[in-house]
């Protein structure tokens, strides 16, 4: 799968482009990890509970992870980010749809006030990519995923990253 690496300069006053979807977006908790693992396994075929716990525990104070649920409480996606002087990046995450991914991205972008984080969308996520462009995002690179063994095509939106991942 090919991914568009994009960056967006977030204004000092914040990012205020919310996507309406009737979703609840909140900070992830350790109690969400099991559902996050199940969702990512279904969407992308990998499991990394250890990473999710590390991000949510946030002992270094640089990680932020959100979950997105529907009105029934079903987990539809999650998205993490790192905000450190050496790396300002959004991901990893997965979403059931482009709309879910965009809602989580919009929420995380506001936490990067006055900064310029990088995030990745699959090149096939046309609505998400076009929406990011409309917000002022720009391309910086293209990346390709690879795997050993049999490939499992994603069953949703995957937003990878270059952070410490065990997947």
Predicted feature locations:
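Amide-forming acyltransferase catalytic core, primarily the GNAT-like/NAT-type
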Residues: 1-89, 99
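Residue-level signal for alpha-helical context at structural boundaries
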Residues: 54-58, 108, 123-126
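A structural signal for short coil/turn segments at secondary-structure junctions
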Residues: 59, 112-113
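Conserved acetyl-CoA-binding loop-helix of GNAT-fold acetyltransferases
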Residues: 97-110, 130
């Amino acid at each position: 799968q090919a991914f568009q690496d994009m960056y967006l300069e977030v204004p000092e006053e914040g990012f205020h482009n919310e996507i309406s979807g009737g979703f609840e977006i909140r900070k992830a908790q350790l109690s969400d990890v099991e559902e996050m693992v199940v969702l990512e396994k279904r969407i992308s075929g990998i499991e990394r509970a250890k990473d999710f716990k590390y991000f949510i525990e946030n002992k270094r104070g640089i990680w932020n992870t959100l979950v997105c649920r529907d009105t029934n409480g079903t987990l539809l996606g999650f998205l993490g980010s790192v905000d450190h002087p050496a790396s300002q990046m959004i991901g990893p995450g997965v979403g059931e749809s482009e709309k879910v991914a965009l809602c989580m991205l919009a929420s995380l972008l506001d936490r990067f006030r006055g900064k310029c984080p990088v995030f990745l969308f699959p090149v096939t996520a046309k609505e998400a990519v076009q929406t990011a462009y409309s917000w002022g995002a720009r391309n910086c690179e293209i990346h390709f995923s690879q795997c050993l063994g049999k490939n499992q095509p994603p069953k949703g939106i995957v937003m990878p990253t270059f952070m410490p991942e065990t997947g």
